[in-house]
Every structure is written in structure tokens, then in C-alpha cells.
Amino acid sequence: MRWLIAPPLRRFVALAALASLLLNLALLMPSLYTLQVFDRVFASRSIETLAMLSALTLLALAFGYCMDVVRARALAAAGHTLMERLSPPALEQALLRAAGAGTRNGVDRVRDVAQLNQFLHGNGVRALFDAPWLPIYLGVIALMHPWLGITAALGAAALATIAVAAERLTRERTDALTQRARAVGRHAEALVRHAEAFVGLGMVGNALAAWRRQHAHWLDQQGHLGSTSARLSALARMARQGVQMAVLGVGALLVVGADASPGIMVAATILLGRALQPVEQLIAGWKQLLDARGAWRRLCEPGSAPRSSASLRLPAPIGRLAVERVVFGHDPQRPALLKGVSFTLAAGESLGLIGASGSGKTTLARLLLGLRTPRSGSVRLDDADIAQWNRHELGPHLGYLPQEVAFFDATVAQNIARLGAVDDAAVIRAAQLAQAHEVILRLPQGYDTMLGDAGIALSGGQRQRIALARALHGAPKLVVLDEPDAHLDAEGEAALKAALRMLKGNGATVIVVGHRAGLMAQLDTIAVLKDGTLQAIGPA
């Protein structure tokens, strides 16, 4: 649990530790109260002594309550700090992984951060702070009588053995169950994401059957782990009760032999119950402890932190592009998808990428934007490797229209502005450049129409034009359009051609992935890809 003493959390954890110290000191009072009542009050029959002891004990318990609240708030503040520090980079890494490798499990890192925060709000972390007090409690019991201390120590060792067994029996299965649960969740998300195809093709039954098999396997794993945890938890409860009975029995023998007072017998039993309670809680919540530890381990894995961008701020690009012997493939053990591709474009030039499906056009388009990292070779924008650019600074100078258009849960204007501050003039200028202004005005609320999952349903042509406007927002210097003529009718295709001419007039470097000869005729150069190699390149 080294993450608990990470520098951002250290002051909160230190405060929680101090509060735990004072809390456990306060919780010694009930045992001392019992001892004094049996040994002093009963012997002296003094009401004043009883009243004073009761008042002191109530005061100690009130103080303990305050310290428990302080500890809870300190741990909650630690969780808040953890979420603030780790959630944004975890989400950024999820976005980069999804864009760079096409994987959607990067969001699991965000869930891992939430798992740590949940642990800091649970009972398991409190038990961690209380468990170190076990030796001190055992020492106090031993001071009451050595045999009571020995009996209590043996009982604590038995509970510690159960805790070790819980670690060994549940650690690997807990990690596997977490991964399985997330896989089941991703499977369900994929079904919902492609619902139209499943329903349209009558695949709902088969899709549900496949998901049900995966879900059933997860339920079986969960049941086995839950059964093991329940048995260990029940064993810990019975062991604690047994240890308390043993201490009570040994205390009774000592009382009968006149080696201890009844007050010592009862006080030792109460104190032992308090000492063993956090150990029992740790065993009962061992899964939460392992979940938190696994979450931190995954967050510390290589590649879990966002790739650092260049610290030196480069000047705004003018759009000069150079692709030098680029080789790319997802799996080093399989043939590369792109093999030694090279070409250059001066600022303001345009290039059309054509080729059969699977030839590598879309992969190359993503490489040009820095969404993929080549195995060898380089993609240079204004002589700087695309990886050297700060993504946040470079983004406004790039325009991208992917094959699969997606909009955020925001207005049309906010989507075109890329979720940044909406400059009305810039948004309208981008829409006009994409020939989408009139299309947007015909929507129910115009530029204020909501898009995304909770927004209006758009036709394919409407989506394509608004997405093109988003790509052109801010007068980008490098524009990559992946099959921008998809879903467009004759009017939309004419608008796209006009947009390409305006981009050329504005000095933007444009790369278009497409098939139609009419669209390619608007460009300066055509490159033909086949099986990942550049077969030919020349004037359009």
C-alpha cells in the first residue's frame, strides 16, 4: 500500500494516522473504566468515584468520536486529491490509447482511480490504521497479567494466519475477476454501440447468447471467490469469539486462584475484542484491499502515464510535411501494414491517397496526424517529428475528418469549436467553408441544436458536413480527410469540392483518402497504395 504515502497524500495520511493514534488512546478508556469499576467502585461503594469515572469515560468517547470524524475527513480529502491528480491524466491516457491503438480498455485506468478513491472511503482503510495498535493492546493486556498476554498473543497469531491464508487464496482470483468483469462490461458496451447492426441483421439472440456465456463465466468466478471470502470471514469471526472466550476463561482461572481481580478479567476481554476487531475487518474486506492494490499496480504499469510532450514550444506550423521511410504495424510478429512509405508535400499542396481496401490508406492518414507511432522512419511537420509537438498546442493547427464521425453531447456550435470557447465568427466561418451553414440553420435550434447520444438524430450527409466544419475550424494548416465524400449526395459532393478549393486558397496542406475520380481531380498529387507500399505518386 505504498500509494498511501505518495507525496500528494502524505499530509492527509499523516493527519489520519495522528487521529487514529488519539482515537485508539481514547478507546482504551472503556477497558480502564471496567477495571476501575470492578476493583475500586465495588470495593469502596463510592458514588462519587463512579460518577467521576463515568464522566471521564464519556469525555474520552466524545473525543474519540471527534478523532474518528477527523480521520474520515482526512481520508476523504486524500481521495479527492487522488481523483484530482490522477483522473485527468488517466482519462488523457485512455484517449491516447484509443486514438493510437484503437483499444477501448484505456478507460479502465479511470476506473482504477475511482477504485482507489472508493477504498479511501471504506472500512478497510480504517482497519489498516487501527491494525498497528494490536501489539500495543497486547502489551497492555500482558501488563495486566502475563498469562492473559500470552493467550491474547496466540489468538492474534491465529487471526494473522487466517489473514495470510486470505491473501494467498484470493489474490490471483481477485485480479482475474476484475479483468473478467471489465471484459464483460466492454462486451455489453460494444453490443449497445452496434445495436443498429445487431437488430437490423436479426443477430440480437446470438449476440445475447455470446454475452450470456461470458457473463455466466464471470458469475461462476465471482461465486467461487465470494464463497472463499465468506468462509474466511466467518472463520475470522468465530476465531475472534473463541480467543475472547479463551482470555475470559484464563482470566477466570486466575481470579479463582487469586492471581488476578475480576476487573482485570473483564477489562482484558474487552480490550482484546477491540484489538482484534480491525484484523477481523481486514479479513472480511480483503477483496477491497486487493482491488485497491491491483488498481495502483495497473496505474503504475509502463504506458499507463500519458506520453510527455515536448517542453520547448515550437512555432505555429506552416504545413510542410515529410514522410520518410515509414514502417508501421501493430504486432511486431506480423507483417507490417506500411512498408517504407516516403513522400513530401510543400505547404499548401494537396495529396489524394487511393488504393484497395486494406492497402493502408487510413493507417497512413492516422500516422500523419501522430495518432500512430511508426516502427521506423518518421513523419515530420515543418521538419519536426510529429511526436515532438505538444498535442495541445498542435491540435488547433490540425483538421481531421475520420471515417466514423462522432459528436459530443454538446451543441452544434460547441462541437464545431471542438468543445473550446465558442467564437461565433470562427464557428460560422468554418461552417460556411464546409458548406454546412445552411444545413445547420435548418436544424430545430440551429447552432444551438444538441448533438451526441442525447441530441438530435442527423442524416449521414448532415453528420459529414458538420464534421467537416469541425475539421476546418480555426484555419488549420494540415487537414486530413478520410473518405469525406461518404454519405454525401451530389449537392454535398459539390460543397466538398468547393471546400477543398477554399482550403487550397488558404494555404492549407490537405490529404484526402478517397476513391472517386471527381474528388481526386481537385488535388495536386495522387499517391497509390497497395499492400502497404507506395506504388506510384504523381500529378493528379
Regions found by a protein language model. Give the residues of each.
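ABC ATPase nucleotide-binding domain helical subdomain, centered on the C-loop/LSGGQ "ABC signature"
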Residues: 413-453, 497-498, 502
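Hydrophobic alpha-helical segments in the permease module
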Residues: 56-68, 155-158, 233-243, 262-284
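An intracellular "coupling" helix at the cytosolic face of ABC transporter transmembrane type-1 domains
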Residues: 7-11, 99, 111-120, 124, ...
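Cytosolic ends of transmembrane helices, especially the final helix of ABC transmembrane type-1 domains
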Residues: 76, 203, 227, 274-302
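Conserved signature/switch motifs of ABC ATPase nucleotide-binding domains
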Residues: 474, 506
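Transmembrane helices of ABC transporter permease
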Residues: 20, 57-60, 126-176, 249-260, ...
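Helix-to-loop junction immediately C-terminal to a conserved catalytic motif
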Residues: 369
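Membrane-integrated ABC transporters
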Residues: 1-29, 43, 47-53, 71, ...
